[in-house]
Amino acid sequence: MTIQKLHFLASENNDAQKHKDIFEKKYGSCAIDGAEAIIALGGDGFMLETMKSNMDHKLPIFGINHGSVGFLMNASNDLDLIDRVNASQSITISPLKMSAVTPDGKEHTAMAINEVSLLREMHQAAKIKISIDGKVRIDEL
């Protein structure tokens, strides 16, 4: 399938916003529900945020660096964006699912792309069990 319908998202960075406007004028912009791909303009943090907030859409995300380093992003250049998206190599990322149970038995779950962190509001020691794919790796931390 050739991707044609793009949905553009940009970080608050002025350069990212400027390029979003340029791309939307050149390629048009689809509502996310009608898009075939998401174009994320920003840095690595924006890419991670875009991936997490758009998991339910199950769309490929093509990142273009308008941040500082951009390890997760493609370089910004003047080549045809549709051609670049269609020529890109796809990778699948499996998000992490974090489940936490409070002392009173209430369960909380969250999905994460890059990392999971826990914050406590008390000074008591935390009892943490780590399981990966249903197998206990650390019984108590």
Task: Please state what every model-predicted region is.
Residues 48-51, 130-132:
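Short, contiguous, well-ordered secondary-structure segments
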Residues 71-141:
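Catalytic core of DAGKc-family lipid kinases
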Residues 15, 46, 137:
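Short phosphate-engaging motifs
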Residues 58-60:
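Proline-centered loop/turn at the N-terminus of a beta-strand
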Residues 43-46, 67-69:
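Short glycine-rich anion-binding loops that position phosphate/pyrophosphate groups of nucleotides
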Residues 1-37, 41, 49-53, 76-91, ...:
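ATP/NTP phosphate-donor binding region
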